[in-house]
Amino acid sequence: MATSTTGSTLLQPLSNAVRLPVDQVNFVVCQLFALLAAIWFRTYLHSSKTSPFIRHVVATLLGLYLALFCFGWYALHFVIQSGISYYLMIIIGVENMHKYCFVFALGYLTVCQITRVYIFDYGQYSADFSGPMMIITQKITSLAFEIHDGMFRKNEDLTPSQRCLAVRRMPSLLEYLSYNCNFMGILAGPLCSYKDYITFIEGRSYQLQQSEANGKEDTKYEQTDPSPNIAVAQKLLICGLSLLFHMTITKTLPVEYNIDENFRATASWPVRVFYLYLSLMAARPKYYFAWTLADAINNAAGFGFRGYDKNGVTRWDLISNLRIQQIESSTSFKMFLDNWNIQTALWLKRVCYERATFSPTIQTFILSAIWHGVYPGYYLTFLTGVLMTLAARAIRNNIRHYFVESPAVKLCYDIITWMTTQVAISYTVVPFVLLSVKPSFTFYSSCYFCLHIASILVLLVFPLKRTQKGNKQHESIQPVWSKKLEEENLLQKNSYSTTNNSFSQKEEITCRYQALKQ
């Protein structure tokens, strides 16, 4: 565990008191400060009280201050990466800038990850400057593709989601830095579309279309400013429970104990499997805490409103990154992945899967692995994950229909698939936590590579059925990201244009309404 930081050491006494690395304490305290700043931002710098210019300046300066406090001079990487990417956008032009920005941003991130891991602090599993750079890389590449779509490609060549997200004018440098480095998302994200962010900063009114009871479309224009207080309070409660769990239970269930020689020699197989599940389940609350707190910060500032449901209840999950209940109750590999790190899955689909001219599945998994980092354990997890995903899909496609007719039988099937999914997920992500090759292979060899072998046997026995609706150029084996076409509209229904003068108001309302219907 890390005991030093490149950022401020002002909170070292607090770090000693709570027995956490000072860089992690800096992260939590800065996020709590960002939460208070978000409330202040929404109250005193509301779009009705000040100009977008002031909101951009304040959001950017606060973000850079938090970055400097947490990471010291390493925070300059955020500005350098953003600045060079913006320069590339300007000098190269809209036809090819998305390619150059993609290669540069991902390459710069990879170089920083290599230097951090193999030169400075291999194995430190704490807050580090490459984490925010991963989010900034997503934003840089997403915006580059969105500008390319909006300013170069023909409207009829775009998919519905690309049409909704397309940016029709070049952002100013201030807008660009504000989008990449604002205080709400500088430390933990999550990714959001540029148009959603600009809509929030400029305080554009929501134009809602709802369906009347008789099925006719009723267009309503509302100047809405719903309160996020309830949503923020609920998410802070989740953060508190997650942090309490992490501080108490997680420390008693280390993942490393799965490869302890004495434990492997003395524990029975049921005990080992049960501990495997418990230890990996206990490793998740820190992600629940970080991502839910980041979501709450954005909501507190007034960002993240996704509209109203059919009952008129506000929804504040536009940029939510996970769904905890669905994760813990997942009965399939796909269901788990669909609800984990949602915004990253959508980014992979937007910039890679739907644009790949060949082998979109392979290209998407490669991009995901490169983006996550350079620890060997990450690649072992992704390779194992591919195998598990294919095997799970083969089983589901070939046998599930035998168990859905009877409620009692389906309940038994769901229980069995839940247990299997949780164990398979835990088995798959052990290298992601252990990081290195040797301990990862120690774990897998102690399990005799049982789930790897079982997955291969499943693929040999059960055929992989082709998706009837699949495009002929896509593989029959599609990753979870390719199946989020409808979900993206659901999550991105605030993505109507604020920068497009040529994109008609009627088209934008239709874009939003189609998302609301789902």
Swiss-Prot record:
InterPro entries: LPLAT_7/PORCN-like (IPR049941), MBOAT_fam (IPR004299). One of its GO terms (cellular component) is endoplasmic reticulum membrane. The keyword Hydrolase does not apply. It catalyses: a 1-acyl-sn-glycero-3-phosphocholine + an acyl-CoA = a 1,2-diacyl-sn-glycero-3-phosphocholine + CoA; a 1-acyl-sn-glycero-3-phosphoethanolamine + an acyl-CoA = a 1,2-diacyl-sn-glycero-3-phosphoethanolamine + CoA; a 1-acyl-sn-glycero-3-phosphate + an acyl-CoA = a 1,2-diacyl-sn-glycero-3-phosphate + CoA; (9Z)-hexadecenoyl-CoA + 1-hexadecanoyl-sn-glycero-3-phosphocholine = 1-hexadecanoyl-2-(9Z-hexadecenoyl)-sn-glycero-3-phosphocholine + CoA. The keyword Lipid metabolism applies. The chain crosses the membrane at residues 21-41, 60-80, 87-107, 183-203, 230-250, 267-283, 365-385, 415-435, 443-463. It is found in: Endoplasmic reticulum membrane. Its main location: endoplasmic reticulum. Its EC number is 2.3.1.-, 2.3.1.51, 2.3.1.23, 2.3.1.n7. Pfam families: MBOAT. It is a multi-pass membrane protein. GO terms for biological process: lipid modification; phosphatidylcholine acyl-chain remodeling; phosphatidylethanolamine acyl-chain remodeling; phosphatidylserine acyl-chain remodeling; phospholipid biosynthetic process; regulation of chondrocyte differentiation. It is an enzyme of class 2 (transferase). Keywords: Acyltransferase, Endoplasmic reticulum, Lipid biosynthesis, Lipid metabolism, Membrane, Phospholipid biosynthesis, Phospholipid metabolism, Transferase, Transmembrane, Transmembrane helix. Acyltransferase which catalyzes the transfer of an acyl group from an acyl-CoA to a lysophospholipid leading to the production of a phospholipid and participates in the reacylation step of the phospholipid remodeling pathway also known as the Lands cycle. May catalyze preferentially the acylation of lysophosphatidylethanolamine (1-acyl-sn-glycero-3-phosphoethanolamine or LPE) and lysophosphatidic acid (LPA) and to a lesser extend lysophosphatidylcholine (LPC) and lysophosphatidylserine (LPS). Prefers oleoyl-CoA as the acyl donor. Belongs to the membrane-bound acyltransferase family. PANTHER family: LYSOPHOSPHOLIPID ACYLTRANSFERASE 2, PORCUPINE. This is Membrane-bound glycerophospholipid O-acyltransferase 2. It comes from Gallus gallus.
